A protein has these predicted regions:
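Conserved, charged catalytic cores of large soluble enzymes
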Residues: 5-14, 99, 125-164, 184-205
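Secondary-structure capping and boundary motifs in well-ordered enzyme cores
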Residues: 25-30, 68, 79-80, 109-120, ...
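A glycine-rich phosphate-binding loop feature that marks nucleotide/adenosyl-phosphate handling sites
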Residues: 57-59, 108, 143-148, 181-182, ...
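Structured secondary-structure scaffolds
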Residues: 1-134, 176-180
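Basic, alpha-helical terminal appendages of large translation-related enzymes
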Residues: 166, 181, 185-374
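Alpha-helix initiation and N-capping motif
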Residues: 12, 35, 73-76, 85, ...
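Residue-level signal for cytosolic alpha-helical hairpin/rod architecture
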Residues: 73, 106, 158-162, 220
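Short clusters of hydrophobic/aromatic residues that line enzyme substrate/ligand-binding pockets
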Residues: 18-19, 66, 104, 140, ...
Length: 374
């Protein structure tokens, strides 16, 4: 670890920046080395130890340890292509309690993406931005009319950064994410409580409506700022939609309420997390795993898995096959081909048989003349 950072070599120059590590993350099966031998090596070198050792468990598949020999390994590249890396990262970190094993399930993953990301976060952003565009042409007026009902949402938002900090310091990432989504759920509830669609019908309630929508935009800003370390690709898209300039998206501002300009301008964008067809996706993902497991089973038994859709013959059919030997009389390369050889072979019939085969990479024509083949 420290050599790669530049310790006692001139190739790298990051040792002073990154060592000692604030958190050293390791898997539970290598804890003994990192908790005993590695610290002893550092002490012998008179170097500081990592400040905290975080040990994570294994991710199992439906309760079973993932194994290449079994074929039940979930391919993260396949999942990333289908649902996006942010969604997969969120699901794993939300499901996994550090220090314990976590069971991965395609069904639980897809349902969580739909419920947390598409329904809760995605709909909150979409509804809020859509209402600002519908009632104010995309730009909120500066007039405000606060009400008592606003205070619970505002106080919940203001308390969020401290709560997430506490969980992150304990490397309880799942609990930090749970706290952030409590605020997102509270913001969705606030929409139902304040009924902005009713306020929008009354011209005298425009200032009140602007206040409600501004509070929602601020709740989105704070929660997505804290989510950005978990979902770094998607959150900038949210900030663009809610009119949050990059300079406003800071850790310090995540502890404040009222950072967005009063006359903020929003810009509706595509759905952040489109809903997934659960049944269709589960069938396709299970089919992939099933295919992997069949191939692994065949490999373990020394057999090659038969291509899907191609029937295999039985021993009775094989017994009907007539095998003949033939002596190669002539052999020459096929013109304009790098692989093919044309062979004239005597199999005991009236005249030689012509055979074309792709073996020129392995045999020279003159090496085959006189050979007997089946």
């Amino acid at each position: 670890y420290i050599t790669a950072l530049g310790y006692k070599n001139d190739k790298y120059n990051d040792f002073d920046k990154f060592w000692p590590a604030d958190v050293h993350m390791v898997a539970k099966d290598i804890m003994r080395f990192h908790a005993i031998i590695w610290p002893a090596m550092l002490m012998a070198l008179d170097l500081p130890l990592p400040k905290h050792l975080a040990v994570h468990g294994w991710i199992t598949f439906n309760g079973q340890k993932m194994s290449k020999s079994i074929g039940n390994v979930v391919d993260p590249f396949v999942l990333g292509e289908r649902y996006g890396c942010d969604a997969i990262r969120y699901h794993i970190l939300r499901e996994m309690a550090l220090g314990a094993d976590s069971s991965f399930s395609n069904e639980i993953m897809i349902n969580r993406i739909n419920s947390d990301l598409a329904n809760d976060l995605g709909n909150l952003v979409s509804r809020t931005v859509a209402m600002v565009e519908k009632y104010f042409g995309g730009t909120l007026p500066a007039d405000r009319e606060p009400a008592e009902i606003d205070n619970e949402l505002i106080n919940t938002v203001l308390a969020l950064r401290k709560k997430t900090d506490e969980y992150l310091d304990l490397t309880q990432l799942n609990n930090a994410l749970a706290e952030i989504f409590k605020v997102i759920s509270r913001a969705n509830k606030y929409i139902d409580e304040t009924t902005p669609w009713v306020l929008g019908k009354d011209e005298s309630k425009k200032a009140r409506l602007a206040t409600v929508l501004y509070n929602l935009l601020e709740a989105i800003r704070v929660s997505t700022t804290l989510l950005s370390c978990f979902m770094p690709t998607t959150m900038p898209k949210v900030w663009e939609q809610i009119g949050a300039d990059e300079s406003l998206i800071t850790y310090e501002n995540a502890g404040k309420f009222g950072v967005l300009p009063a006359a903020v301008t929003v810009k509706k964008g595509p759905a952040l997390f489109p809903r997934i067809d659960v049944e269709k996706e589960i069938d396709e993902l299970n089919e992939l795993i099933s295919k992997q497991m069949k191939e692994a089973e065949a490999k373990a038994s020394g057999k090659k898995a038969a291509p899907e859709g191609i029937a295999q013959i039985g021993i009775d059919d094989f017994a009907k096959v007539e095998l003949r030997t033939a002596k190669i009389l002539e052999c020459e390369p096929v013109k304009k081909s790098k692989k093919l050889l044309k062979i004239q072979a005597d199999d005991g019939t009236d005249k030689p048989r012509q055979i074309v085969c792709g073996i020129s990479e392995y045999y020279k024509p003159d090496e085959l003349i006189g050979k007997t083949v089946i």
